[in-house]
Amino acid sequence: MNTPATQVNRLAAGMVGLGMIFDETYRPFFEAVRQQPLYDPAFGICQVDLAAVASRTGRRADAYRSAGKLGDFESFKEPDAMGQLLKARDLNFVCVATPDDRHFAASKAVLEAGKHLLVEKPSVLSLAELDELDRLARQNDVLAKVVYHKLLDPDHKKLRTLVHDGQLQHVNNGYCTLLEPKLISGEQFSEWIRGRNPGTYVAVHYIKLIDFTFGGRLVQVSCTGQRGIVGPADGDTWDSTQLRLIYRYDSGRDACFDIHTSWVTPNNFPGYVEQEVQFRFDNGVWNGHSRKRGVECTIEDQTPFNVKISINNHYNAPVVEPWGERAQRGYGIEVIERFAREVAHVEYGGPAEERSKRLEAARSLHYNDVSADRQVVAAVHAMEAILAKHAAGQPGAVVDVDAPEGGLVLRLPGVAEPEVLYSGRVAAK
């Protein structure tokens, strides 16, 4: 009889979207786990196979399959790539890495099919959509998780540890910035960039970092931005955004966080992105610069275009190990492995009759479960609405959270009647 230590279990994975994020994080994970399966004393050996992918044209899928490092997966392209993927194979989980305004439809289909879900941030763009995903996950007894890889950044882990252990006491305010190059808005994401903003795409990293690390209750959201480079100066496509969040804590005190994002940094910038955080506490200050971590490299005729001068070896680093193995490691890949381990533990981590207990234990992990994503999505929902008003000629809106009128209440200067964006309560009761 097989024991957990020798039994080989299997998870079949589906992938929706084969763009930049897939190449940087999912591809390295699936390649590595194909060579070295997951192992844990609770679930034994677990082989994870990329079984099927859905994409718009199928061209990238053909190239990856030809390379031979991901196995012989099935590839489905439009029309109805998603429907074909879910019908063709008996998948255990599906990863969704599409443009952010397409997350909901794909994620909903995955959960309706009874598959575990991992979706890129932001999970969805509205609280009503989040409610639906959470409902479907519970109804069908599967996990619904979100990729927040910055929580696994070793610097951010240390920040949270100092807060968790009470060494850094009561955050007062914070500033975060993440500036993407023009390559993102002008080339890599050009097919879906119209009508979008960099705040939803990248500020959400720091919304989650703030929400998860410091706790508290989100009470107000405001936002402004600039246009004219990616799209018309009077259009609805944004070059940069400045988001402000107000949180309130059990002490009755507030904290203010400003998050500045853009995707119009010159392509010859020394780092792939510019990113930093600063948080002030009652008894200290945390400064973290995620680009300038001490490594600079110049290579003639390579930097700063093909190779960047400042290298983030924590996120995603292709390396040759001292023992000769070529590998790709980093927190961007680790977060996907963590999800696969959670699924393996739910399905194979003990007796079948105790699966529901294991499922609830996995759902209680607030760093990535959709049930813990309410305040993050509330901020995204509010930001989207504020920027839409701004683009329509009504700047300066503020959204109050869990106000007397509703969960998300948008107020415009000079307009007496507020607009209720979401009637339910945002904060957990």
Which stretches of residues belong to each language-model region?
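Beta-strand-loop-alpha-helix segment that lines the small-molecule cofactor/substrate pocket
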Residues: 92-93, 99-151
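A structured beta-alpha segment of the ubiquitous adenosine-cofactor-binding alpha/beta core
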Residues: 73-96
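N-terminal Rossmann-like dinucleotide-binding module
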Residues: 2-70
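Predominantly a Rossmann-like dinucleotide-binding segment in NAD(P)-dependent oxidoreductases
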Residues: 150-236, 356, 395
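NAD(P)-dinucleotide binding in Rossmann-like oxidoreductases
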Residues: 252-337
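Active-site beta-strand termini and strand-to-loop segments that position acidic
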Residues: 236-254, 279-282
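C-terminal helix-rich "cap/oligomerization" subdomain common to oxidoreductases
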Residues: 2-7, 338-429
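Glycine-rich, N-terminal phosphate-binding loop of Rossmann-like dinucleotide-binding domains
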Residues: 97-98, 178
